[in-house]
């Protein structure tokens, strides 16, 4: 998967921005379906995007997929 730098730079192109954000929301939604409790909290997708923005600004060399898994684990708590 790409690094968090690519996530942060996504805002430069509307198509890339939409693709990255749709992927993240779909990934978290997929984890949500496989679990026993609602991780998404009624669909607060802005909060999901904001979490990833903060994570990727803090650790730009992280892989997007790993950051998304970490988000999923945090939401599952």
Language model: regions and residue ranges:
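Short N-proximal segments of mature Sec-exported proteins
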Residues: 1-54
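Surface-exposed, polar helix/loop patches in the mature regions of secreted/periplasmic/lumenal proteins
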Residues: 45-77
């Amino acid at each position: 998967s790409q690094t968090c730098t690519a996530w942060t730079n996504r805002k430069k192109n509307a198509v890339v921005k939409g693709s990255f954000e749709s992927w993240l929301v779909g990934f978290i939604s997929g984890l949500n379906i496989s679990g026993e409790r609602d991780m998404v909290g009624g669909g607060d997708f802005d909060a999901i995007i904001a979490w990833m923005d903060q994570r990727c600004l803090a650790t730009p060399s992280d892989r997007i997929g790993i950051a998304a898994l970490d988000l999923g684990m945090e939401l599952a708590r």
